[in-house]
Amino acid sequence: PEMTQVTTRNADPDGLGIQQLSMFCFDKAGDFISRVTPEQTVNQDMLSGTFEAVVPKFTKIIHFVANQNLESFNEQGNVGRHENSIIPGLISSSSMLVYWGRVECPDNQELDDYIQNTLPDKTVPLYRNQAKITFDGGDLFVVTGFAVCNGYAFGTVAPFNTETKKFDWSNTSNYLSLPNDRTKFTDPTEVNETDTEYVFESDNPSADQMYVVFRGYPQNNPDAELYYRVSLLDGNTQEPLSIIRNHHYKIKITGNLENGVPTFKAALNTPPVNNIWISIDEDIPEVSDGEHKLIVDETFVVYDSGEEGAQGRQKVLKYTYGTDTDPMKPVSEAEKPTVTWMDNNVAAPGISNNYDIS
């Protein structure tokens, strides 16, 4: 999801893009060698760009970490420590969104050869370490502000699977990587006049739930503006939802609201409203109309500018389109999708679409 023009208490608007990037280099055994700061060029959207770096000779594993405050990181003291010990221990506060990605080169291949010839599209996907929460009042309701309450003040930089002992995260993963420090942030005293909030992962236990207070009024009736409280519940089970990094939680108002109160303070203790529906989107978009489904493989990547022909290179974006069934099936040649530019002021106008129906 887009991350521009956002004003929130939980994430500084100046911290929503890539401000700085570090590369943690490990050998084939996963032992730390050194940290490298690449020369980078960040695009105007602050969410993509290119980088160049010289890494140690025996590097086989690289963790990419963007926007993390590393002033207290003891590089010399960490030499020889395993990646499973170093990376899961990196903790961030809510002042900036932190991005993380990892590449691992096979033991029988040189790193440069792997990046140039094997790494898919020569790109490294980066995952945000916070979740995104938005409101949609639809045609029924105008939301004039909201605030998240009872959330964690800190979060881990990278997702680490404690069961497999691997960094095997993808957008379909549902495990949490919580810090040892479960300190809660100070709850706000008023809503933020924003359409987006960012929060750290949370197990969201029933006895200590994260919740949202929002302010708004029915369409065409601004004099009826009130405050409401909503719990983040699964629509099927009515159990609290786990808050997972790099996921988008959309709170949609689907009917007339009850239990509105005149002040933010009163809303903190009022019963949750009804007629609320929450949907969860991975950062990798998936859209369905009930009959057909479109899945886009990549929306957030870092490009390697050191490759041959960087100025004239072509970028391949993969998608899957077919029937909304299990398993998904391709459509016929006559039904294949059309791909066009919506807006383009940085690339050559040519665009091609190869749809494989095999």
Located regions from the model:
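Beta-sheet-dominated interaction scaffolds and their linkers
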Residues: 124-125, 269-318
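Surface-exposed binding patches on compact interaction domains or structured appendages
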Residues: 294-298, 310-316, 320-357
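Acidic Ser/Thr/Pro-rich low-complexity disordered segments
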Residues: 31-35, 70-104, 159-167, 330, ...
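Short strand-edge motifs at loop-to-beta-strand transitions and within beta-strands
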Residues: 49-51, 120-122, 249, 353-355
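Tryptophan-paired
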Residues: 6-77, 111, 132-245, 319, ...
